[in-house]
UniProtKB/Swiss-Prot annotation:
GO terms for cellular component: cytosol. Pfam families: URO-D. It comes from Bacillus pumilus (strain SAFR-032). Keywords: Cytoplasm, Decarboxylase, Lyase, Porphyrin biosynthesis. This is Uroporphyrinogen decarboxylase. Its EC number is 4.1.1.37. It is an enzyme of class 4 (lyase). GO terms for molecular function: uroporphyrinogen decarboxylase activity.
Length: 352
């Protein structure tokens, strides 16, 4: 029997701003699309089968840890996973994304939404987490959920949108109906994350992919109170809490106000700029994923710049500003991870 690897808690330490031997790294969408092993799996099984069979899902979740040497695993699931359980039928269509044939657009639609019971509705999610825990994954496992605004935008628009005009129209014209939906989705998020933590995740990230469509004033009025409730109620779970959104640099100070541990940055705002804005909590990010399609010299230069900014504090985790593209080479991600670890370890050693 092979020797069990020691548990790597670098990511968890960085979430709290504790000293580490190197900067921890993991990548959004690190599991799946860019890996040949995953593509081979997709030739045998559909996405539904992979995500609903704990053994397959655990395998996909584990792959980047074994191949790239990242400091955390993130559960391989979709943010849409809990919606069918509350009465919203979702189909993931190739080349489009989540599609909802019966959008949620009225108060009556919202009132018909049910409650989430993870043990009954999503046993395959919890079984996957427990399987990874039993297999002694040697890095923390990150759970996640979609934020109420992003979930609502899919539910109201019926799928991806460029301008979210139906979503924003409901928010502006029927604020009470909007808040009813926000609170129902907040309840779902809290219940879902609690179940994931109970099953064994060591941290979680809330993805608000499309919240950048709102200005700061509207965010504070229509979204922030709900996010405050989510993080306040989940604080008792005693695991690091991460917030991330796309194109939302104008909202990071509002995120920083929330009782969370880590603020995720996309590539539009540098780490230095975020610190100048007064963000003292742990920052996570923020290499533009497109750069991973460039020559290695370019990747190294950009990664070094981000590390130099991030390492001014122990409150830093290296990630991308968005998810890994399908055409990124796994070798590039391995090389990047090694560079992050080696470069940051030398810096930290020399600064002792």
């Amino acid at each position: 029997m092979g020797k069990t690897k020691a548990f790597n808690d670098t990511f968890l330490k960085a979430c709290k701003g504790e000293k580490t031997d190197h900067v921890p790294a993991w990548y959004m969408r690190q599991a799946g699309r860019s890996q040949p092993e995953y593509r081979a799996l997709k030739e045998k099984y559909g996405l539904f089968e992979i995500t609903h069979q704990p053994e397959l899902c655990a395998y996909v979740t584990r792959l980047p840890v074994e191949q790239y040497g990242v400091d955390a695993a993130i559960l391989y699931k979709d943010i849409m996973t809990p919606l069918p359980a509350i009465g919203v039928d979702v189909e993931i269509k190739n080349g489009i994304g989540p599609v909802i044939d019966s959008p949620i657009r009225t108060k009556a639609d919202i009132e018909r939404l049910g409650e989430l019971h993870p043990e009954e509705d999503l046993p395959y999610v919890l079984d996957t987490i427990q399987l990874l825990t039993k297999e002694q994954l040697n890095v923390p496992l990150i759970g996640f959920a979609g934020a109420p605004f992003t979930m609502a935008s899919y539910m109201i628009e019926g799928g991806p949108s460029k301008n979210y005009h139906k979503t924003k129209a409901l928010m502006y014209s029927e604020p009470e109906t909007w808040m009813l939906l926000m609170n129902k989705l907040a309840d779902m998020t809290i219940t879902y994350i609690r179940a994931q933590v109970k099953a064994g995740v060591s941290a979680f990230q809330i993805f608000d992919s499309w919240v950048g469509a709102l200005n700061a004033a509207d965010y504070r009025t229509f979204i922030k109170p709900v996010m405050q409730r989510i993080f306040t109620e989940l604080k008792s779970e005693n695991v690091p809490m991460i917030m991330y959104g796309v194109g939302a640099s104008h909202l990071v100070k509002d995120w920083h106000d929330l009782p969370l541990d880590v603020v995720g940055l996309d590539w539009r705002m540098s780490v230095d700029e975020a610190r100048k804005e007064g963000l003292t909590k742990t920052l996570q990010g923020n290499l533009d994923p497109t750069i991973l399609l460039s020559p290695w010299e370019v990747i190294e230069e950009r990664a070094k710049d981000i590390l130099d900014q991030g390492m001014k504090s122990d409150h830093f985790i290296f990630n991308l500003g968005h998810g890994v593209f399908p055409d990124v080479s796994p070798d590039t991600l391995k090389k990047l991870t090694d560079f992050i670890h080696d470069y940051s370890a030398k810096h930290k050693k020399s600064s002792i």
